[in-house]
Design a protein with these regions (language model features):
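N-terminal low-complexity, acidic/polar interaction/targeting segments
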Residues: 1-225
Length: 225
């Protein structure tokens, strides 16, 4: 189904996924105008990754959930990704100081098999990553972990789960863009699982080395001096 529409376009050095929140600081005059314009309408614009060789072909629509204007005209906003689009045509003319784009909305292809097993495995691996990361950062273990609670909120939707975990991984933006462009949910889950397994191995190794160094190379409790 063709669902072409025209939206304000905001090229950025990030990859926005549906179902995820992104804070932005609006300071350029043209984007101040964009924010003013969309606040009068549906509060929606498109974010597309600005690559070294131009704009990516796929981006995400976002809804401005919170907008906090500052006294000097700048604003801090919080955007929520809603759906993906393919760029059909970028429009740069005198009608607005910012670019607009004709876009086509799209979703993942229908999945005929249950992806519950893949989703559970990915969620469990993500929990290990967060735990190891917290250890490395010296945060106390136990208690609620916001990222895992957020992952549980989208656990029943493999597509949203894949987007949520992808957005939380410290990987190259070109890889995130690849995942954003995929339309096969199962394939995206598998690719993210492979990447996540590598990251978990690295983090758990660093966390283990960190624990050993705190005990001066001995097992047991850290020495007190």
């Amino acid at each position: 189904m063709n669902d072409r529409q025209t939206v304000p376009l905001f090229p950025l050095g990030l990859v926005q996924f549906p179902g995820t929140l992104t804070p932005l600081h609006i300071f350029e005059q043209r984007y101040r105008q964009m924010l003013e314009d969309i606040q009068e309408g549906d509060k929606t614009f498109g974010i597309v990754y600005r690559q070294a060789d131009g704009l990516a072909e796929v981006g995400s629509l976002v809804h401005v959930a919170i907008a906090r204007p500052l006294p000097d005209g700048r604003s801090n906003i919080l955007c929520f990704g809603t759906t993906r689009f393919r760029l059909f045509r970028v429009i740069e003319d005198d009608e607005t100081p910012y670019a607009r784009a004709e876009i086509d909305i799209f979703e993942d292809d229908p999945a005929f098999d249950s992806l519950e097993e893949e989703s559970t495995a990915l969620r469990d691996l993500f929990a290990r990553l967060i735990t190891a990361r917290r250890r490395l950062e010296g945060q106390p273990e136990g208690g609620p972990i916001e990222e895992l609670e957020d992952a549980s909120d989208v656990a029943d939707d493999p597509q949203l789960l894949s987007f949520f975990i992808a957005s939380n991984l410290d990987v190259d933006l070109s890889l995130k863009q690849r995942w954003l462009e995929m339309t096969n949910t199962a394939l995206r889950l598998r690719e993210i699982h492979r990447q996540l397994a590598d990251l978990v191995g690295e983090y758990e190794k660093k966390a283990h080395i960190g624990r050993i160094s705190k005990t001066n190379g001995h097992g047991g409790h850290p020495h007190s001096h």
